[in-house]
Amino acid sequence: PKFKHKQLKFNEGNVIYSIGDEAKNVYLIHSGHISIRSKHGLELGNLGPGEIFGEVGRVINSPRTVTAKAKTDCIVYEIDWGNLQKKLDEADPVLVAITRGLSLRIGDANELAEKLWLELSVYKSLE
């Protein structure tokens, strides 16, 4: 990556960050796969090489709303938020607003997915 970063290695099952953690940095997957999970364990995403995660909390300036866990052994680049913030500060305000809006919608969609998953689990348990 062209940003200031630190290479991190995680073994399968390692937690990279948990719900409620401060959103300090974002991550770029170099190798392996990362599972993004809700507070009740619903897998909201399965990310692989070249994908970024951890950006939502930074963009909307809130604590982590999901848990990121290594699904396989993996190498990720922890990207310094300061460098990304400079890019956002220099970006077209319309693009920044779109990015923030999309990030908020991702959070809302994750909450809705978990709610529906929990309701489905209750219905299945009644069968």
Predicted regions and their residues:
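Cyclic-nucleotide recognition modules
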Residues: 46-99
